[in-house]
Amino acid sequence: MGLGVESKLGDSIVTTRLDHAVNWGRSYSLWPMAFGTACCGIEFMAVAGAKYDVSRFGAEVVRFSPRQADLLIVAGTISYKQAPILKKIYEQMCEPKWVISMGACACSGGFYDNYTTVQGIDEIIPVDEYVAGCPPRPEAVLDAIMRIQEKAKTESIIKDRVKEYKGFLDA
């Protein structure tokens, strides 16, 4: 329902809400940072390759600094020694930020059920999308990126998720 202004302006001006415009831009300009520690890190290279063309989703520029990234892809096993490093990388990312847990090891510890391995990175940082598999297919990772895009289109532009999440390192 318009205010009646649209009929007088014609096609020369488009009206929208600020949330919609900002979220549209965010959803098509995701800047991923891969935290690859095992086989899934190698599989992520296939996702970033030409065959799967991740650039059509606006995520082709892989960053190597957390301050330049807004999508963290954790691919592989995380040990308890690596947990504070992963937490620090997540905290250095600017808002809004999203996390994909890629592979069985990142999602649930994989077959490493021992005292040195974190049984899922959701014990450390909040996770937006889980991609199962050992290693997962590149199509599954692309599907997770598309779901992150949908989340980016619907989120409020003034949300801070760091303050509302408590992992085992915060205790």
From Swiss-Prot:
Disulphide bonds annotated for this chain are none
Where is the protein found, in the record's own terms? Cell inner membrane
What EC number(s) would the UniProt record show? 7.1.1.-
Which terms in the Gene Ontology molecular function aspect does this entry carry?
A: 4 iron, 4 sulfur cluster binding; iron ion binding; NADH dehydrogenase (ubiquinone) activity; NADH:ubiquinone reductase (non-electrogenic) activity; quinone binding
Membrane topology field = Peripheral membrane protein
The residues listed in the UniProt record as binding [4Fe-4S] cluster, with positions renumbered to this chain, are: 39-40, 105, 134
Catalytic reactions of this protein: a quinone + NADH + 5 H(+)(in) = a quinol + NAD(+) + 4 H(+)(out)
GO biological process, any? electron transport coupled proton transport
The record describes how the cofactor is bound as: Binds 1 [4Fe-4S] cluster.
What cofactors does this protein use?
[4Fe-4S] cluster
Keywords for this entry?
Answer: 4Fe-4S, Cell inner membrane, Cell membrane, Iron, Iron-sulfur, Membrane, Metal-binding, NAD, Quinone, Translocase, Transport, Ubiquinone
Q: Does the keyword GTP-binding apply?
A: no
Subunit structure, per the record?
Answer: NDH-1 is composed of 14 different subunits. Subunits NuoB, C, D, E, F, and G constitute the peripheral sector of the complex.
Its annotated function is as follows: NDH-1 shuttles electrons from NADH, via FMN and iron-sulfur (Fe-S) centers, to quinones in the respiratory chain. The immediate electron acceptor for the enzyme in this species is believed to be ubiquinone. Couples the redox reaction to proton translocation (for every two electrons transferred, four hydrogen ions are translocated across the cytoplasmic membrane), and thus conserves the redox energy in a proton gradient.
Similarity remark: Belongs to the complex I 20 kDa subunit family.
**The protein's name in its UniProt record:** NADH-quinone oxidoreductase subunit B
